[in-house]
């Protein structure tokens, strides 16, 4: 069994095991007890960190990615290996934060430390000028509202979110007429 299957690596102790004697497994790097699977038998995959049934994919076999919840084709990257981040829409270098992993929030300009909040991950909020703590509120996350002078609780009214309208003496909706700003 050993001589007919394992060929040049028959002298290795692990190659004498019956579960390793398959044509697809007979490689120097693959004749190991826990690594003899067709999908696992590649040099870059036969590592101690990759010996899991759920982790034998070529794209998954890196030390920081070999975990059951990380072995997906679109999620096998070091920065993506978090339980809350292993999704197709979240596996990006700048977007793998637990609070950032929603489809509408996974954009480079939105995934910042000050912007990755559950209350701020909305399409209307994900612009570079809107990603700061004072702007990420339900009543303030609008592109036209999210500029530094406008980002305040008082100024972000539904009818009054024009930069030219929000001044210290005119923070109320009744002041925001076109002739009043």
Swiss-Prot record:
Give the matching InterPro entries.
Answer: KAP
Q: Cite the Pfam families for this sequence.
A: Keratin_B2_2 (PF13885)
Of the GO CC terms on this record, one is: cytosol
Query: Annotated region 26 X 5 AA repeats of C-C-[GRQVCHIEK]-[SPTR]-[VSTQYC]: where?
Result: 5-154
What are the BP-aspect GO terms? hair cycle
Q: In which tissues is it expressed?
A: Expressed in the hair follicles.
Q: Which UniProt keywords apply?
A: Keratin, Repeat
Ranges occupied by sequence repeats: 5-9, 20-24, 25-29, 30-34, 35-39, 40-44, 45-49, 55-59, 60-64, 65-69, 70-74, 75-79, 80-84, 85-89, 90-94, 95-99, 100-104, 105-109, 110-114, 115-119, 120-124, 125-129, 130-134, 135-139, 140-144, 145-149
The record's function comment reads: In the hair cortex, hair keratin intermediate filaments are embedded in an interfilamentous matrix, consisting of hair keratin-associated proteins (KRTAP), which are essential for the formation of a rigid and resistant hair shaft through their extensive disulfide bond cross-linking with abundant cysteine residues of hair keratins. The matrix proteins include the high-sulfur and high-glycine-tyrosine keratins.
Instruction: Give the quaternary structure.
Output: Interacts with hair keratins.
The UniProt entry's sequence similarity note says: Belongs to the KRTAP type 4 family.
Write down what this protein is called: Keratin-associated protein 4-5
Source organism: Homo sapiens
Question: Gene name?
Answer: KRTAP4-5
């Amino acid at each position: 069994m050993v001589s007919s299957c394992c060929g040049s690596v028959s002298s290795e102790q692990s190659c004498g095991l019956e579960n390793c004697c398959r044509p697809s497994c007979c490689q120097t790097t693959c004749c190991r007890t826990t690594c003899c699977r067709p999908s696992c038998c590649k040099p870059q995959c036969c590592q101690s960190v990759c010996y899991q049934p759920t982790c034998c994919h070529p794209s998954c076999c890196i030390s920081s990615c070999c975990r059951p919840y990380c072995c997906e084709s679109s999620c096998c990257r070091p920065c993506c290996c978090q339980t809350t981040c292993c999704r197709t829409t979240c596996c990006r270098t700048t977007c793998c934060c637990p609070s950032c992993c929603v489809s509408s929030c996974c954009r480079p300009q939105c995934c910042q430390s000050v912007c990755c909040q559950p209350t701020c991950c909305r399409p209307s909020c994900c612009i570079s000028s809107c990603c700061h703590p004072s702007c990420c509120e339900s009543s303030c996350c609008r592109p036209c509202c999210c500029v530094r002078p406008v980002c305040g609780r008082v100024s972000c009214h539904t009818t009054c979110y024009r930069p030219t309208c929000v001044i210290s003496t005119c923070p109320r909706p009744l002041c925001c007429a076109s002739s009043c700003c």
